[in-house]
């Protein structure tokens, strides 16, 4: 995310766990270690579980119109384990998907043999995704780079959500 932001100032970045935190301004630091230290010091809901539907609701309400204009490509980096309401998750995923050009979910578990996204949350998440890709090693980052390179960059803005 840091590298993509350094490539284009149109990249917005958020974390979500039990609440939404915008971290874009921390990515302006010249050193990635400084940026990560600021994020770690500021985001208070690391390892607190995820309520994806609630945090997407906050994003859609507070940030959607501001950062999803112009055919945004959204990358969500999450294992998808959700502790919130499934109906709310479904509604907010639908709203998010309708608001963007492309919705790509990057799952760190997807690259491991035997993993299947069988949670109730994933039952409602999957129909709203344009792409469901692994993000577990350097090769998966290269694959993501190829997928993004195939998009029409002149019409797309990229927003990121990273799980806390």
List the predicted regions and their residue ranges.
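Acidic, glycine-rich A-domain
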Residues: 2-164
């Amino acid at each position: 995310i840091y590298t993509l932001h350094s490539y284009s100032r149109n990249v917005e970045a958020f974390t979500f766990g039990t609440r939404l935190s915008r971290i874009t301004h921390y990515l302006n630091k010249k050193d990635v270690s400084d940026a990560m230290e600021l994020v770690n010091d500021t985001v208070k809901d690391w390892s607190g579980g995820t309520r994806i539907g609630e945090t997407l609701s906050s994003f859609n309400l507070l940030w959607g119109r501001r950062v999803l204009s112009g055919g945004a490509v959204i990358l969500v980096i999450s294992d998808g384990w959700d502790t919130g309401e499934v109906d709310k998750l479904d509604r907010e995923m639908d709203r998010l998907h309708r608001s963007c050009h492309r919705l790509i979910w990057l799952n760190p578990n997807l690259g491991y043999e035997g993993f299947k996204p069988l949670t109730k949350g994933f039952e409602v998440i999957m129909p709203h995704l344009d792409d469901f890709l692994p993000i577990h090693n350097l090769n998966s980052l290269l694959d993501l780079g190829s997928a993004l390179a195939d998009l029409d960059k002149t019409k797309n803005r990229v927003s990121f959500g990273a799980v806390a």
